[in-house]
């Protein structure tokens, strides 16, 4: 997706109010599978088969993304992908995601709508449900995602289990996102593949669990 500037003539999030904004983000979300109670109450409730694995990830505008490099849809997808990848690296199955968004009150509602669409798209790709979150105002856009994952009766596969002489296996592409940052930083938009790797990373969902079930002694998200 090619980023475009926000439509500053559109309504701003400060004009629609927090509850209306939350309604736009969560419209149509329900509860299924391990999620017994999703958005709309003080807490979400999940039923798990094993131990709970939890990880959180924060993205700050100007540090982890730039709006002239990434569209709102891209930012939403990246927020989910970066967080869920950590659960995958423990051999856990992601089941729930809590997401908080802080943004300037002057930001167009259109940006939040596109961001939410990206979050939903990546949640669907990852097989995880958005179960809650928070919104507030801030000078810059800050997105924090927390993933809740089920180990399903298996022990967590930590970084500490690696031993000399073991086989090292890699799933996914190494260095492409960093190459994308370097390309964009020089004012270019191609090679497109590495630019997209920065804007919208695509973790190999399911590979972490498969590795854990196959007996991997160590896992890490890099």
Which role does the model predict for each range below?
Residues 1-222:
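Helix-biased detector of long, well-ordered alpha-helical tracts
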């Amino acid at each position: 997706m090619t980023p475009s500037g926000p439509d500053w003539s559109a309504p701003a999030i400060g004009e629609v109010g927090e509850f209306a904004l939350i309604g736009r983000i969560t419209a149509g979300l329900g509860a299924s599978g391990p999620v017994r109670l999703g958005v709309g109450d003080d807490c979400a409730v999940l039923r798990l088969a094993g131990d709970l694995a939890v990880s959180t990830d924060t993205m700050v505008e100007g540090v982890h993304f730039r709006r002239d490099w990434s569209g709102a849809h891209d930012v939403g997808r990246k927020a989910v992908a970066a967080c869920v990848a950590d659960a995958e690296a423990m051999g856990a199955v992601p089941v729930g995601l809590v997401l908080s968004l802080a943004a300037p009150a002057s930001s167009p509602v259109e940006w939040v709508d596109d961001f939410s669409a990206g979050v939903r798209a990546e949640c669907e790709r990852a097989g995880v449900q958005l179960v809650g979150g928070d919104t507030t105002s801030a000078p810059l856009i800050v997105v924090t995602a927390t993933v809740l994952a089920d180990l399903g009766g298996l022990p967590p596969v930590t970084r500490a289990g690696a031993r000399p002489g073991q086989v090292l296996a890699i799933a996914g592409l190494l260095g492409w996102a960093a190459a994308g940052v370097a390309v964009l930083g020089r004012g270019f938009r191609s090679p497109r593949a590495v630019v997209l790797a920065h804007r919208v990373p695509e973790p190999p969902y399911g590979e972490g669990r498969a590795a854990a079930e196959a007996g991997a002694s160590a896992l890490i998200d890099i």
